[in-house]
């Protein structure tokens, strides 16, 4: 056999053994992304989606009206599918060391990250924005109101069937034993002081002042639970100061201790603030008009397990997420963004009523966020209140 044939056969072996498998692997990894881009491009071409990359000037933004939250069942939001992706994932940063950070009582750290006395900078735009109803492969409607955004490999048909099932626990609204736990893995997340069309970039959007961070939103939830007679615990430990790293490890330890002491608790709600920002730095303030007032729109996150996350009962959390979503939409039309069902953990293995709730974003005012806390509390009180 001459050297030319030998070389050709060697090249053929290399192509079959290495190049083709590598190409197939790379295509498999990218196929979903290419498909999604193609779907979006087709949607743009057909007028289904309207990208919102070109921004108006600050003066135009100041006079821009809030999109009405009164959406009919058949109305599709005019916002871009890209905008739905702008909300970043909650960072579940593990502890750097093997030692879990110790949470700190809120009263001990009140002045550690003070809320700014004034914000004179005007170097960023805040745009009000209302998430509506969406069409597309990832979305399906709930019978009771609201939507789910399915970012998993499970089919929408399967999840729709599950969404109609009742939640898998019972709340004793007449019991003196706590039934609900409200806590905040990222308690220092904060908001704008007032309803504004600009922000000061020197403000970190974090504070240990409990009147201006997530603790105040939790307080509003709990005030309504009080009125409904539902026993609860509001854990005000600060898990993300002095270090953000390991905050989920810290809150997990605290929640487990509370559940051991109070096994009557069925529902654990980790209440956060989102951070939605365009590439040009514009911050979005998701809002809905509820009974003549602006409320920060909320998003429920329900985690799915791909078999590696230790959450065998994740579907029971999903049942509760759908029930709560529909109850909120029934009570306060337009308050919710679609439930995010995705491969997330967020300590949702600890009960079968564990959810994460994002209230507004860093473009919202503290008043808008606190009002949403009040509305969440009213709905929970209606769902679980006793006679």
Regions found by a protein language model. Give the residues of each.
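N-terminal catalytic or cofactor-binding beta/alpha core of small enzyme domains
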Residues: 13-264, 275-280, 374, 382-387
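A short, glycine/acidic-enriched catalytic loop
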Residues: 200-204, 276-312
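Active-site-adjacent mobile loop/cap segments within catalytic or ligand-binding domains
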Residues: 336-387
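Solvent-exposed loop/turn segments at secondary-structure junctions
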Residues: 187-190, 238-242, 273-278, 305-308, ...
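Soluble periplasmic/extracytoplasmic beta-strand elements of cell-envelope proteins
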Residues: 179-184, 233, 267-272, 299-301, ...
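Alpha-helical scaffolding within the catalytic cores
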Residues: 252-255, 280-288, 339-345
